[in-house]
Amino acid sequence: MPAAAAAAARTMAARRAAGEPLQYIFGPWPFRDLNLRVDARVLIPRPETEQVVEVALGEARRLAAAAAGAGPGDGAGPGLVAVDAGTGSGAIALALASALGAGVLRQVWATDRSAGALEVAAANVQVCSPMVAGGLPDIELVRGSWLAPLPERLRGHVDLVVSNPPYVTEEEWAGLDREVRTEPRQALVAGPGRTGVPGLADVEAVLEEALLWVGRPGAVVIELAPHQADAAQDRARQLGYDEVRVEPDLAGRPRALVARRSGSE
């Protein structure tokens, strides 16, 4: 083995022995039909999130069918506006964009508080764009918390919000494997919600902020922990969402909260 290759192998072995995840060591990692760069600045996308994307795609197609033949309210052209709130590596934004294309999506906005995460997302957008037939719809990366950094002109004109916010509790974090705890803590751990349910604070925050941005009809899809499903549905109904349900993951556990706004008040 050449000396350089041997040195690289030793470095990888040392990183693995220190508990670093394989996804960070080997670089590009599959998520749906994409190969995404992930490193210690972002959460590693998981199969549960792939299923959340499937649910979101169903909502997007439903909204697109309902809007067929009607232009958007802001006069900027046809197609849906989607938001990936807390994008991390850009996995959800890119999965939506690649699956739906510019024929369905006019624009995807991806937000994150972390400058490092947005750097990773930008690199993934650059790499994935040439690999998607017909190219990707416009993807805008903006820094800020949840939906706050969106431009004011989008208020009331967003069609779909999708998010995988932190929902791990403090107690759960303490018991996680060392490998998982190498991922960004701020991307995993959340405080209690308004009702005191552990780990629900950020799920609730996305639900609350989305009301200011999502038009009618519109939808919000949020990943959560199974034990949070009932409380999250209750909160969505309290906030005034018209249709609320939770879809299961591949293991049959409650995983994707869907909160819809109907076409009229």
Residue spans for each PLM region:
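Conserved AdoMet
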Residues: 1-59
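Conserved Class I SAM-dependent methyltransferase catalytic core
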Residues: 192, 196-260
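Conserved SAM/SAH cofactor-binding pocket of Class I
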Residues: 51-174, 205
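Class I S-adenosylmethionine-dependent transferase superfamily signal
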Residues: 96, 180, 206-210
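Conserved beta-strand segments of alpha/beta enzyme cores
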Residues: 35, 107, 138-140, 242-245
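Mobile active-site "lid"/loop adjacent to the S-adenosyl-L-methionine
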Residues: 166-205
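Flexible, glycine-/basic-rich loop-and-beta segments that form/coincide
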Residues: 262-265
